[in-house]
């Protein structure tokens, strides 16, 4: 399924070049994120409290609990997290880059958006998504054991990876998939009917839900969800053969999560899902076959430019303090 034809070989030099630029970006990003060069990001003070042991870590993921048994120096822990995150990304791209245009788009998105949203600000989520890059690849080539191992590693770095445990059977088992559609329909009806208030309260106040939920609302349709839908449509149209089915089921699973969390007023988790699945759709574009169409690439570039504007100018991801 992965592109290995003779026509591809001539582009290896181009891929090598863009990969070198990406490595340079990783190195610079690693330094900037570790030093908080532009000032402390909006989440940095929270991480100081968590990793210094000032805030209770009862629901903190296993990886960080382990690190805190060794040290409670927040700078050391953040350094380890970022080292792992950057190394995993570099290793993945070194092993599985097959599509020059997909790799280029990934590079642009990372340099303009993901570096700042994830590695500069959301350290834990950034490490989790880096590991999930391998998960979607193993899902794509139908390697169940490797898929579950990588997902468990991702869960150990961020609870938002928990739903990925059901992704493999959703993609490869029609019975599980139809059961998933049924459960999703029930949850949607429950939320729309207003009968799910007690269930929402339970989620928000039980364990992990204390972190992923809050009282704010979230609009199901917004600029970020629309950009994700548009990106999927373009990617789906430009994909070839079995890649279409894989991409469709992967995106469908993400949509069901996003809709569920949105309807049950869990905005933190809903936007985590948007960030995660958009990043992973770009990751998939690195190793699948796609039709060469400059119009598709142009529209994808417009989406990336909008996201750059949104995160930096509207959302203010580098909303630094002292």
Which residues does each predicted region cover?
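Juxtamembrane segments of multi-pass membrane glycosylation machinery
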Residues: 66-81
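Short acidic/glycine- and proline-prone juxtamembrane loop motifs at membrane-interface regions
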Residues: 120-126
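Transmembrane-helix signature of polytopic, membrane-embedded enzymes
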Residues: 93-113
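Transmembrane helices and adjacent periplasmic/lumenal helix-loop junctions
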Residues: 151-167
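Start-transfer (signal-anchor) and selected internal transmembrane alpha helices
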Residues: 1-28
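Alpha-helical transmembrane segments and terminal signal-anchor/GPI-anchor hydrophobic tails
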Residues: 11-20, 34-65, 163-279, 312-322
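Membrane-interface transmembrane helices that cradle and orient dolichyl/undecaprenyl
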Residues: 132-146
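Transmembrane-helix motifs of polytopic, lipid-linked glycan transferases
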Residues: 80-99
């Amino acid at each position: 399924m992965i592109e290995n034809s003779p026509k591809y070989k001539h582009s290896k030099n181009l891929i090598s070049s863009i990969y070198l630029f990406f490595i340079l970006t990783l190195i610079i990003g690693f330094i900037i994120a570790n030093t908080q060069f532009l000032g402390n990001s909006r989440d940095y003070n929270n991480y100081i409290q968590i990793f210094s042991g000032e805030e209770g870590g009862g629901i903190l993921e296993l990886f960080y609990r382990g690190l805190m048994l060794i040290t409670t120096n927040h700078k050391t822990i953040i350094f380890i997290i970022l080292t792992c995150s950057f190394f995993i990304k570099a290793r993945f791209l070194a092993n599985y880059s097959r599509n020059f245009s997909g790799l280029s788009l990934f590079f642009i998105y990372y340099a303009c958006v993901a570096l700042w949203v994830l590695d500069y600000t959301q350290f834990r989520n950034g490490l989790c998504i880096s590991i999930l890059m391998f998960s979607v690849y193993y899902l794509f080539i139908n390697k169940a054991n490797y898929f579950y191992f990588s997902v468990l590693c991702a869960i150990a770095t961020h609870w938002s990876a928990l739903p990925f445990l059901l992704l493999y059977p959703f993609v490869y088992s029609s019975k599980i998939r139809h059961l998933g559609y049924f459960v999703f329909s029930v949850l949607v009806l429950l939320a729309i009917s207003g009968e799910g208030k007690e269930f929402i309260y339970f989620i928000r106040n039980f364990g992990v839900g204390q972190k992923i939920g809050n009282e704010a609302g979230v609009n199901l349709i917004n600029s970020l969800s629309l950009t994700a839908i548009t990106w999927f449509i373009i990617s789906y149209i430009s994909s070839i053969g079995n890649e279409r089915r894989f991409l469709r089921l992967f995106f469908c699973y993400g949509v069901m999560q996003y809709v569920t969390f949105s309807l049950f007023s869990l905005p933190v988790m809903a936007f985590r899902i948007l960030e995660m699945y958009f990043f992973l759709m770009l990751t998939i574009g690195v190793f699948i076959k796609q039709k060469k169409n400059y119009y598709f690439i142009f529209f994808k570039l417009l989406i990336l430019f909008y996201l750059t504007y949104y995160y930096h100018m509207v959302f203010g991801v580098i909303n630094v303090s002292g």
